[in-house]
Amino acid sequence: VHLTGEEKSLVTGLWGKVNVDEVGGEALGRLLVVYPWTQRFFDSFGDLSSADAIMNNPKVKAHGKKVLNSFSDGLKNLDNLKGTFAKLSELHCDKLHVDPENFKLLGNVLVCVLAHHFGKEFTPQVQAAYQKVVAGVANALAHKYH
């Protein structure tokens, strides 16, 4: 993904303030609530019967944290997202059979959650930079599908 120096600074500056535990669980939870068909990939997570059940589900929170820790790794390797996410792309494609469109959906949900958490600090410039990053990550995760 190509980011200017300023965009990289905006992304990494805000990311340093992100509570990965909280934001990860919230982003994944919101994905499962807003796009209920994505729940089929999480059959082993127990109760996903309502928005409250999903948002308070410890397995959703734990996996959300795991997802954002991987996203953090991507932010450290913006010039090699495909390499950074190669194994995860293979896992999600070959073993889990996740629709690659879901990566885009989760990226967009993450941007919304960050905007909610950071308010005015999440400026249009920050949003634009994050949109580039989540698109790049989604593309890297979908790489093995091509």
Swiss-Prot record:
Pfam families linked: Globin (PF00042)
Residues recorded with modification S-nitrosocysteine: 93
InterPro entries to which the protein is assigned, alphabetical: Globin, Globin-like_sf, Globin/Proto, Hemoglobin_b, Hemoglobin_oxygen_transport
Protein name per its UniProtKB record: Hemoglobin subunit beta
Residues that hold heme b according to the record: 63, 92
UniProt function note: Involved in oxygen transport from the lung to the various peripheral tissues.
Lineage per the UniProt record: Eukaryota, Metazoa, Chordata, Craniata, Vertebrata
Tissue specificity remark: Red blood cells.
Residue list for modification Phosphoserine: 44
Subunit structure: Heterotetramer of two alpha chains and two beta chains.
